[in-house]
Amino acid sequence: MTEREFVSVFRSSKKGDTYLFVRRGQKWDDLPEALRGIFGSPIHSMDLLLTPDKKLARTTGKEVLAAIEEKDFFLQMPEEQDTYIVDFKRKIEQHRK
């Protein structure tokens, strides 16, 4: 695994709270077509020097670097919400109306 790597982070134009980590300078057209289609137009969020010990919001630098080394990208999806909680909130809102 790489000791450190400059990476670019993009957010999805189609899916909220979805981020793509790639090597800085990675060509969008070189990524899998299925990924590009689902992700939509990439919106640049930031560039950073990533090391294995770096802690990120939902993952670690080690996981991101390993994925980039293996498949040229790391896709961070939104955390799954417990549908019970979502349904409960919806019922509360409906009750208030």
Swiss-Prot record:
Superkingdom, natural source:
Bacteria
Show the InterPro entries listed in the entry. Answer: YcgL-like_sf (IPR038068), YcgL_dom (IPR027354)
A Pfam family the protein falls into: YcgL
Q: Which residues form the YcgL domain?
A: 5-89
What is the designated name of this protein? Answer: YcgL domain-containing protein Maqu_1609
